[in-house]
Amino acid sequence: MLSVMAATLNYIDEQVKGGLILPYFEDIDAEQWQEKIKVLDIYITDEVEGRELNLEARQKDYATNILSYPSDLPAAIIGLMPTLPLGELIICHAVMIREAAEQNKEAVQHISHLLIHGVLHLLGFDHELGQAEQDEMERFEIEILAGLNIPNPYN
């Protein structure tokens, strides 16, 4: 999992250097983004709790594969901190394993994709806002996965 997280953040770092603005971190300048160590929490849950959390967070009454809870700290507070908290990811293990089997994917490939997807949500990217946003997010995911020698999950 660490290699997936490192690849994701390295990719985003390069995109920020190229001018990408991160929706949830637009008040943080590129230099501060580059300097800070990024941190996040990852929690693994079961279907019962996953369903409860999805209902509470998204008003959807089923367990989903991954939930993202972005950090909402103001830039002024982040500026005082030694690290940059991105937020929390909650993975429903049973859903992730079931989806991998249904999609004929190795579990490690599927969890890698979900972690990348979740981190992008923590940064403010949202495929549910429209086709352009979905295309951008999927492009990021595909490029990061390719760097890890994992095939395009959308094929």
Swiss-Prot record:
Q: For this UniProt entry, what is the primary localization, expressed as one broad class?
A: cytoplasm
Q: Which PANTHER family match?
A: ENDORIBONUCLEASE YBEY, CHLOROPLASTIC
Q: Which GO terms describe its biological process?
A: rRNA processing
One of the entry's Gene Ontology molecular-function terms is: metalloendopeptidase activity
Show the GO cellular component annotation of the record: cytoplasm
Top EC class, one word: hydrolase
Keyword list (alphabetical) reads: Cytoplasm, Endonuclease, Hydrolase, Metal-binding, Nuclease, Ribosome biogenesis, rRNA processing, Zinc
Q: Which gene is this protein's source?
A: ybeY
* PROSITE patterns referenced in this protein's UniProt entry, alphabetically: UPF0054 (PS01306)
According to UniProt, the name of this protein is Endoribonuclease YbeY
**The species this protein was found in:** Psychrobacter cryohalolentis (strain ATCC BAA-1226 / DSM 17306 / VKM B-2378 / K5)
- Which Pfam families does the annotation name? YbeY (PF02130)
In the Enzyme Commission scheme, what number(s) does this protein have? Answer: 3.1.-.-
Q: Name its cellular compartments.
A: Cytoplasm
Cofactor (UniProt): Zn(2+)
**Cofactor binding mode and count:** Binds 1 zinc ion.
Q: Which amino acids does the record list as binding Zn(2+)?
A: 117, 121, 127
Task: Name the SUPFAM superfamilies for this protein.
Answer: Metalloproteases ('zincins'), catalytic domain
The record's comment on protein family reads: Belongs to the endoribonuclease YbeY family.
* Function noted in UniProt: Single strand-specific metallo-endoribonuclease involved in late-stage 70S ribosome quality control and in maturation of the 3' terminus of the 16S rRNA.
Cross-referenced InterPro entries:
MetalPrtase_cat_dom_sf_prd, YbeY, YbeY_CS
